[in-house]
Design a protein with these regions (language model features):
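Extended, charged helical/alpha-beta scaffold domains that provide interaction surfaces
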Residues: 1-307
Length: 307
């Protein structure tokens, strides 16, 4: 109550921030800074007029510190977001992502206190959006190029569109007629753009790397919330058992093709096919350890797979 009366009389009170986050006004604990937001510790007995005055005083006091923090965040190089699409600074959310025009272009919204001026907010938002775009462009370069590709051939354009709409992995059989109408020259152009036209699948090999899979699937799940319940396979796996009911469509965009009780990564499947061709004699081929090691499964499961 003494603090409240002092505030109403416009008395200048001493303010400090202890232990990085504790806000102290006139030697009284007022709350904590969590990232770029103030969380006041208001007593249940405080009057509404007191609360209003306390909030005003606290926000005036912390404004310089929050602006300083914005500067620190802007200077930092690293940006990442967690599974609930929040961008954090020192374990506290400062922004979050929402679906944008497509899965590679999410929107970014700030989670900051009103004590931060509009200019600093805009500076922070522009900085975070720039870092996010840089992350996407760096890790998912082939997908980005695919979305921006300008080919004259209608079939090539249609293939690129379909491949982008399927997050860089799709069954060849779906667009095989289209593929047959693509010239050798256009196939070479597609290869330069990072597109692999395989025996069974059309995909972007670089987008099957662990970091790329993690990022593009996170962005996909943000844009298509119905896929949130599905889990990305652990990185480094070429072979999965279908022990529970898995979603074949989701696992395909993760890079895995279904074979009844098993899943195999599509690029590994292409390599297996080439090994079989190399070992083929009169329509027969000999299974060797290289084939089994390539898939990363037991000999027993390999034979079941061939069945």
């Amino acid at each position: 109550s003494i603090l409240s009366r002092s505030l109403k009389q416009d008395i200048i009170l001493g303010t400090e921030i202890k232990n990085e986050n504790e806000v102290i006004i006139d030697n009284q604990y007022m709350g904590q800074l969590k990232g770029l937001k103030l969380e006041l510790d208001l007593k249940s007995g405080s009057l509404k007029t007191d609360i209003k005055s306390l909030k005003k005083a606290a926000r005036q006091a912390i404004s310089p510190e929050l602006i300083r923090r914005v500067g620190k965040i802007v200077e930092s190089e690293v940006l990442s977001f967690n599974d609930d699409y929040k961008i954090c600074w020192k374990d506290h959310p400062i922004a979050y992502l929402t679906p944008g025009k497509n899965y590679l272009n999410p929107k970014l919204e700030l989670l900051v206190d009103d004590a931060i001026d509009q200019e600093s907010k805009e500076k922070l938002k522009n900085n975070l959006e720039g870092k996010l775009q840089k992350l996407i462009t760096s890790e998912l370069s082939d997908l980005v190029k695919l979305s921006e590709a300008k080919f004259q051939n209608n079939y090539v354009r249609a293939l690129c569109y379909q491949l982008f709409e399927n997050n860089g992995v799709m069954k060849r059989e779906i667009i095989d007629k289209m593929v047959k109408n693509i010239s050798k020259e256009d196939r070479a152009s597609l290869r330069k753009a990072g597109v692999k036209i395989g025996r069974y699948h059309i995909f972007l090999p670089k987008m099957l790397k662990p970091n790329a899979v993690d990022l593009r699937i996170k962005l996909w799940k943000l844009h298509f919330p119905n896929d949130q319940k599905y889990i990305i396979p652990k990185s480094g796996l070429n072979f999965l058992k279908n022990e529970s009911k898995k979603n074949n469509k989701f696992l395909l965009i993760c890079g895995f093709e279904n074979f009844d009780k098993f899943y195999i990564r599509v690029d590994i499947l292409e390599r297996l096919f080439l090994k079989i061709i190399e070992n083929n004699k009169n329509g027969m081929f000999k299974i060797d350890s290289d084939m089994i090691n390539l898939i990363g499964c037991t000999k027993e499961n390999f034979f079941k797979l061939l069945e």
